[in-house]
From Swiss-Prot:
Name of the protein this chain belongs to: Co-chaperonin GroES
Keyword annotations: Chaperone, Cytoplasm
InterPro entries xref list: Chaperonin_GroES (IPR020818), Chaperonin_GroES_sf (IPR037124), Chaprnonin_Cpn10_CS (IPR018369), GroES-like_sf (IPR011032)
Stated family: Belongs to the GroES chaperonin family.
Cellular component, GO annotation: cytoplasm
Function of the protein: Together with the chaperonin GroEL, plays an essential role in assisting protein folding. The GroEL-GroES system forms a nano-cage that allows encapsulation of the non-native substrate proteins and provides a physical environment optimized to promote and accelerate protein folding. GroES binds to the apical surface of the GroEL ring, thereby capping the opening of the GroEL channel.
GO molecular function: ATP binding; metal ion binding; protein folding chaperone; protein-folding chaperone binding; unfolded protein binding
Transmembrane intervals: none
């Protein structure tokens, strides 16, 4: 897992996208133009959660190391130390993949 000095705020989650397969099971190479935008990522860092109306933090549903599925067009792309990351809000995360 990447070691980054980025600390997400509130209910934001920093993820690194899991690259999609470049070949099919039968060995055919998938060209870049035919690939769909990936929606699976590994959680790198998690914010402390949003503040609720009663001044308590709303706990986060994900933790570092989780593999998640996120909304196709959610988040903000960023580069840090030559690596590409995506900064999502917790609402952009649709599911946790249990392994």
């Amino acid at each position: 897992m990447a070691n980054v000095n980025i600390k997400p705020l509130e209910d934001r989650v920093l993820v690194q996208i899991v690259e999609a397969e470049t070949t099919t099971a039968s060995g055919l190479v998938i060209p870049d133009s035919a690939k769909e935008k990936p929606q699976e990522a590994t959680v790198i860092a998690v914010g402390p959660g949003r503040w609720a109306d009663d001044d308590d933090r709303i706990p986060m549903d994900v933790k570092e190391g989780d593999t998640v599925v996120f909304s196709k067009y959610g988040g903000t792309e960023l580069k840090y130390n030559g690596e590409e990351y995506l900064l999502l809000t917790q609402r952009d995360i649709l599911a946790v993949i249990e392994k």
